[in-house]
Amino acid sequence: METDMNEERTGVVTFKGMPLTLLGKPVSVGDAAPDFQVLANDLSPRTLADYKGKVLVLSVVPSLDTPVCDMQTRRFNTEAAGLSDKVRILTISCDLPFAQSRWCGAAGVEAVETLSDHRDLSFGLAYGMVLKELRLLGRAVFVICADGVIAHAEVVSEVSHAVDFDAALAAVKTCLSK
């Protein structure tokens, strides 16, 4: 899982109009999804291999304790009810696992698994999503088909704006039809 942390991209994202720098290697549709290691709410490690054979929605947010991230995670939690059991929705942020667990309990979110990239930014670097100036993840959604290939990749250019839910869900349906 070696990624050059010094790989920087500018001109891709802003936060409330302020330009930010993304660290890590960006991914594109058609790429094999890179592996990563994050922490579950119980502090156990999770890697891409833990979800082998599933269609994955990776909902990437800076922090669950912000309004747009809260809305994004709640929306995917609602959408999960209408999806096949072959689909897993993972929300990844740099929030501590304890904070993620508390937030899920307070929000009644049970259909989305929250995962923390706070420890070593493994996910953020592997997907080119680390906001250098904030040491948080940018906002994005990635859909990975069961064969491990990225079917949808949206990096939101203004971090305070929402992802395109319809496009992500359409990609999930395409993956399920393969």
Name each model-derived stretch:
Residues 2-178:
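Chalcogenol-based redox active-site neighborhoods
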